[in-house]
Curated annotation (Swiss-Prot):
It is found in: Nucleus. This is Homeobox protein EgHBX3. The keyword Iron does not apply. CDD domains: homeodomain. InterPro entries: HD (IPR001356), HD_metazoa (IPR020479), Homeobox_CS (IPR017970), Homeobox_NK-like (IPR050394), Homeodomain-like_sf (IPR009057), HTH_motif (IPR000047). One of its GO terms (biological process) is cell differentiation. Residues 80-139 bind DNA. Transmembrane segments: none annotated. Belongs to the NK-2 homeobox family. One of its GO terms (cellular component) is nucleus. SUPFAM superfamilies: Homeodomain-like.
Length: 167
């Protein structure tokens, strides 16, 4: 896997995770002043004696690489960076929580909800997945705490429903 790395605190050090337009500006800087930056690549399988963490061991990129290949390396790397975390506003969260009461959202319902609250359907899907995992973890943590301390579970929504029918 190829990775840009700073040399003497070059601006390349701030490139990963930035937008593609930012990476294009970096490419222009590299073209104009190639001595300011040096491209490195990961050696993915060095001998164990050379590095305790193989992916952290860097080697200079071969000097035989032409500038067009260099551009492809840089652009490809920037495009593969993960997107920034999306912070939902209160309105979006309230709308998502309202729909949470339904067990399952169809793709169409998810798309409509996403459009209504200004998110992508994928963001809505991931929010529901994350919320389900959070509830599962809270349920598990409450049960572990209750069994360790022999205290009753305080969360009413996690308690099993008991029938209170009077005959």
């Amino acid at each position: 896997r190829i990775h840009p790395c700073p040399v003497n605190k070059c601006k390349c050090s701030r490139a990963p995770g930035r937008s593609l337009s930012y990476s294009k500006r970096i490419i222009n800087e590299i073209r104009q002043n190639p001595s300011k930056c040096q491209i490195f690549f990961y050696q993915t399988s060095p001998p164990p004696s050379l590095a305790p963490y193989p992916l952290q061991r860097l080697r200079p990129y071969p000097s035989s690489m032409n500038p067009r290949d260099l551009e492809m390396v840089v652009v490809t790397n920037f495009q593969s960076q993960s997107k920034r975390r999306v912070l939902f506003n209160k309105f979006q969260i309230s709308q998502l929580e309202k729909r949470l009461k339904q067990r399952y959202l169809t793709a169409q319902e998810r798309q409509e909800l996403a459009h209504t609250i200004g998110l992508t359907p994928t963001q809505v899907k991931i929010w529901f997945q994350n919320h389900a995992y959070k509830m599962k973890r809270l349920f598990h943590d409450d049960h572990v705490e209750a069994s360790v301390h022999k205290w009753p579970i305080k969360s009413a929504h996690l308690q099993p429903k008991v029938s209170t029918r009077v005959v």
